[in-house]
From Swiss-Prot:
Its EC number is 6.3.5.-. The keyword Lyase does not apply. Transmembrane segments: none annotated. This is Aspartyl/glutamyl-tRNA(Asn/Gln) amidotransferase subunit C. It catalyses: L-glutamyl-tRNA(Gln) + L-glutamine + ATP + H2O = L-glutaminyl-tRNA(Gln) + L-glutamate + ADP + phosphate + H(+); L-aspartyl-tRNA(Asn) + L-glutamine + ATP + H2O = L-asparaginyl-tRNA(Asn) + L-glutamate + ADP + phosphate + 2 H(+). Pfam families: GatC (PF02686). One of its GO terms (biological process) is regulation of translational fidelity. It comes from Gluconobacter oxydans (strain 621H) (Gluconobacter suboxydans). Heterotrimer of A, B and C subunits.
């Protein structure tokens, strides 16, 4: 299956993806093959198979929570449009 140029362009616009005209045909074929694959999955007999949202076997590795200053204050402050010492300077919004 291959999607027509109008459909590909519409999907790209909805996804906010900029496409060059020469990409439309290739992308249409790629999207079509994905749709064909999903159609094949619909044909699989899953009778008697319980729905599953995860294996439940894997335990996530957690790191120890430690509060740090990041050790990069000067690097962060270098992005400030204005600063006074080690602080950002922002316009006054409340009088």
């Amino acid at each position: 299956m291959s999607l027509d140029a109008k459909t590909v362009t519409r999907i790209a616009r909805l996804a906010r993806i900029g496409l060059q005209p020469e990409e439309i045909e290739t992308l249409g074929k790629d999207m079509g093959s994905i749709i064909d694959w999903v159609e094949q999955l619909k044909e699989v007999d899953v009778t008697g198979v319980d729905p599953m949202i995860g294996t439940g076997l894997a335990k996530p590795r957690l790191r120890e929570d430690r509060v740090t200053d990041g050790n990069c204050r000067d690097k962060v402050l270098s992005n400030a449009p204005e600063r006074e010492g080690p602080f950002y300077t922002v316009p006054k919004v409340v009088e």
